[in-house]
């Protein structure tokens, strides 16, 4: 259906991403630092775990996508997961920050693996249907862009709020004091997350008409194999997520050891998210209407590339100029992250256009699979660079470690944003082509419905 969605529906949908990020953003902002500086897990072990478990999460996404595509209830295909999958997710979001500090190092690592894997699986079983829900709510391009913008703003505001709430609490705190801080906030956020998921469930409806029966796994996979725009978008998303999570995982180390002021952590997160994504997300629907989704992505990727390169060079002599450069990079990255959701939704119709099979869950899960791989690679790169450069927790760092941190937070994201630009430059699904596809699909559905009506009558 091509109707415009109300702002109440769009806001209600975005609250689901606030809840998502109560679990997700906590990990992105604080988990590596928690493992190394509080729980006593070695940097190399933590980096390896973050990489391997994120790869596990990626495969969990594919499993979740298949589960979602096989479900059909009176609440729809996607909304039931928001109702019944949230409690396990929120429980694991608490457990990952509850590593017993008096255990041996090996036992801590095993506990971290098990709880982080549990968090990843539960997150997949909620986030895959949540993301797929947007494709079932509307086929109207501007509404899809608004849904993407709303969830982008919601996610970024959540990042900023968590940084402001928790960042000052761990400033100059001992590891023992930080344990209590993390325990308190994870419990509070778990309860709030379950409430927000329920509001999201009540605020949304699945409106897109489905004619065909549930396809077999083989047919679903054949549909995916023919979807070239989806694969190109996945590679572009992989690069953007590597860039994003390299910055997130490096930020606390950057302010602590390069700037020597953990109080600047909230400023850094504010620039990255509020100034970046929240400033850029409202612009995306207008940009999409004027120049299309592909060109909007390209502009964002180019801004990100230039901003991160500038950030690397100026950060050694002027913090204010460095923050301006980071804001430019973050705006570009915010544009790409926001428009990415609308591009993914379009690939569902492209697959349906080619094969007659509509597989929202598996399509989104493949997209999320590559995003998780990007998160794994991006989140682990700083840990590996720290380990290779000789990082020792809670000590004055060597020049090699300082350069490693600066590389992780600037040059790594710069390179991957440039690669994303190159890949999407060749992306074939333009807005004009998408409109033609939607018209063709609607015409096919009308013919099918007429045939069904003629047979039954």
Swiss-Prot record:
Entry's induction text? In the presence of glucuronides.
Query: Does the UniProt entry include the keyword Membrane?
Result: yes
**Residues forming coiled coils:** none
Q: Where are the transmembrane segments?
A: 12-34, 38-60, 80-100, 109-129, 147-167, 181-201, 229-249, 264-284, 297-316, 321-343, 373-393, 409-429
Its chief place of residence is membrane
Q: Does the keyword Aminoacyl-tRNA synthetase apply?
A: no
Q: Which NCBIfam families match?
A: gph (TIGR00792), PRK09848.1 (NF007353)
Q: What does this protein do?
A: Responsible for the transport of glucuronide into the cell energized by the proton motive force (probably by symport). Import is enhanced by UidC (GusC, AC Q47706).
Cite the PANTHER family for this sequence. Answer: 2,3-DIHYDROXYPROPANE-1-SULFONATE EXPORTER-RELATED, MAJOR FACILITATOR SUPERFAMILY DOMAIN-CONTAINING PROTEIN
- Miscellaneous section: In some K12 strains, the protein is inactive for transport, probably due to a mutation at position 100.
Q: What is this protein called?
A: Glucuronide carrier protein
């Amino acid at each position: 259906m091509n109707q415009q969605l109300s702002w109440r529906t769009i806001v209600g949908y975005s609250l689901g991403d606030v809840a998502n990020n109560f679990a997700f953003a906590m990990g992105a902002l604080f988990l590596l630092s928690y493992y190394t500086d509080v729980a006593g897990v070695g940097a190399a072990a933590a980096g390896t775990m973050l990489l391997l478990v994120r790869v596990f999460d990626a495969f969990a996404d594919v499993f979740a996508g298949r589960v979602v595509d096989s479900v059909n209830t009176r609440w729809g295909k996607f909304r039931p997961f928001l109702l019944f999958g949230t409690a396990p997710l929120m429980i694991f979001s608490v457990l990952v920050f509850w590593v017993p500090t008096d255990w041996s190092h090996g036992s801590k690592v095993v506990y971290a693996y098990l709880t982080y894997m549990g968090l990843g699986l539960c997150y997949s079983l909620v986030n895959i249907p949540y993301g797929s829900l947007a494709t079932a709510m509307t086929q109207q391009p501007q509404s899809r862009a608004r849904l993407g913008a709303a969830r982008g703003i919601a996610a970024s505001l959540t990042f900023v709020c968590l940084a402001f709430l928790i960042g000052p609490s761990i400033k100059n705190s001992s590891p023992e004091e930080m344990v209590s801080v993390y325990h308190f906030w994870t419990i509070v956020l778990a309860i709030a997350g379950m409430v927000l998921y329920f509001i999201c469930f009540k605020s949304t409806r699945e409106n897109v008409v489905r004619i065909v029966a549930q396809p077999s796994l083989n047919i679903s996979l054949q549909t995916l194999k023919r979807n070239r725009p989806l694969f190109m978008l996945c590679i572009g998303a992989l690069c953007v997520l590597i860039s994003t999570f390299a910055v997130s995982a490096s930020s606390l180390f950057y302010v602590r050891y390069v700037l020597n002021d953990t109080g600047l952590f909230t400023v850094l997160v504010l620039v990255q998210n509020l100034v970046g994504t929240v400033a850029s997300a409202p612009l995306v629907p207008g940009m999409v209407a004027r120049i299309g989704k592909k060109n909007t992505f390209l502009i964002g990727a180019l801004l990100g590339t230039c901003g991160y390169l500038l950030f690397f060079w100026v950060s050694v002599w002027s913090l204010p100029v460095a923050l301006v450069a980071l804001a430019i990079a973050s705006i570009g990255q915010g544009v790409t992250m926001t428009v990415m959701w609308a591009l993914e939704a379009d690939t569902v119709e492209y697959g349906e256009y080619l094969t007659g099979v509509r597989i929202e869950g598996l399509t989104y899960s493949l997209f999320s699979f590559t995003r998780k791989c990007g998160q794994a690679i991006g989140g682990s790169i700083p840990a590996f660079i720290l380990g290779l450069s000789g990082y020792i927790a809670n000590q004055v760092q060597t020049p090699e470690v300082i350069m490693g941190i600066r590389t992780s937070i600037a040059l790594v994201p710069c390179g991957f944003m440039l690669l994303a630009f190159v890949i999407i430059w060749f992306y074939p699904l333009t807005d004009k082509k998408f409109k033609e596809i939607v018209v063709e699909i609607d015409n096919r559905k009308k013919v099918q419905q007429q045939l069904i009506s003629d047979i039954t009558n």
